[in-house]
Each structure stands twice: as structure tokens, then as C-alpha cells.
Amino acid sequence: MSEKLESQTCTPCRGGIPPLERAEAEALLVETPGWTLADDAGRLERSFTFRNFAQALEFVSGVGRLAEEQGHHPEISFGWGHATVSWRTKKIKGLHRNDFVMAAKTSELAAGMTQG
């Protein structure tokens, strides 16, 4: 059995490689429950709910720490009791395996918090 996505580390993506094909993205999507493909399979997105603003902010801060540790950064929007996280690799204008690694890490972080 291969290593779970949330246990993997992002690999540097310098651009010049093609983004994942839809079929490749859909295969990895099975390993990231709750996430959806958006923008014609060019972005990975998930919304989370929380008990209040403070918990949503704590989650967003945690995602920020993960992003800095891995050198891969999402788009995040949040407000009272909710947050939406989107992953894509800007250098290739689409999805890379790193996006799925980070989605799995994001889900693991959220699972460790009591959501709303």
C-alpha cells in the first residue's frame, strides 16, 4: 500500500510540466474525500464549517502554517463559522499532485478540530 497523501511532502514544482489530466485528478480525488474539482479540473476546493469565527480563524491560521511548512499556498476565504480552501499550482495553471497532498493535510487539520 502506498503512503497516504497527508503523510507525504510537497515536491518543488518549477513549472514547465503539464497539469494533471482530468482522469489523473479524479483518481487522486478518491483519496481526498469531501474535496471537489472546480474550474474544469484546474482547481481543488472544499468548504468547512465551524462553531464560530474564532474557530474558523484558528483553522485558517493552521492551514497557513501548513502552507509555509510545505512551500505551497492556497486561496482561502472565511468568515463567521466557515472557510473555503482552494488548491491549485499557479506555475502550471492547474493541478499537481502537491495540491492533493495539501488537500489531505488540510482535511486532517480540520478533522482534529471540532467542526460546527
UniProtKB/Swiss-Prot annotation:
Domain of life: Bacteria
Reaction equations catalysed: (4aS,6R)-4a-hydroxy-L-erythro-5,6,7,8-tetrahydrobiopterin = (6R)-L-erythro-6,7-dihydrobiopterin + H2O
InterPro entries: PCD_sf, Pterin-4-alpha-carb_dehyd, Pterin_deHydtase
Entry's EC annotation: 4.2.1.96
GO molecular function: 4-alpha-hydroxytetrahydrobiopterin dehydratase activity
Family under the similarity heading: Belongs to the pterin-4-alpha-carbinolamine dehydratase family.
UniProt protein name: Putative pterin-4-alpha-carbinolamine dehydratase 1
Organismal lineage: Bacteria, Pseudomonadati, Pseudomonadota, Betaproteobacteria, Burkholderiales
